[in-house]
Amino acid sequence: VLEACKQLEKEGFEVTYLKVDAHGLVNFADLLHYIKCDTILISIMTANNEIGTIQHMQAIAETAKEKGIIFHTDAVQAVGSISFNVDAMGIDAMSISSHKIYGPKGAGCLFVRDGVKIQSIISGGKQERGIRGGTQNVPAIVGFGKAIEVAVRDMSINNKKIKSLKEYFVKRLTESIDDIYI
C-alpha cells in the first residue's frame, strides 16, 4: 500500500501517513484529526506481520462510512491468521495475496464492495468487471482458492501452535534475561 500511496502523491493526490503507537495501533484521535472534507480513502493494514498488531477495523470502518469515505484494508498479513467478515466489519475494499498463505506467487484478490467505483488498472478488456484487461491466470486462481481453503481449515490449529511457541519463547527470555520488557 505504501508504494501505491507514493504513486498517488506523484499523480497529485495529498496522502497523509498516520503514526502508530508503541503497540502498532493507529491512533484513532489522529485519524479523526486528519480526515478532511475532501478525504476520499482511508487505507489501513489489517495486521502487522512484524509485531502482530491487529487494528480496530470496525471502528475505523464505521468512521469512514459516517464521513462518506471509502475504507480499504490491506489484509495480506491477516488472511489465514484471523477471522474477519467484510460485511460485519464494514470494509469497502480489501486486498489479499496468495503467496502469504503458501499459494501461487502472482495471484491476489481485491474485494470491492458493490457501489464502490474504482478505475481500471490495466486497460484492454472487460475482465474483472472492466477493472483489469487480459487473460486471467486460471491455475494460479485455483491454487489461491485451495490455499485459502487450507488456511481457513487449519487456522485454529496453526494459531494454537503459534501461541504455544510464543509462550515458550517469552518464558525462556524472561528466565534468561534480567529486567527484560516484552
Where do the protein language model's features map onto the residues?
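Pyridoxal 5′-phosphate
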Residues: 1-182
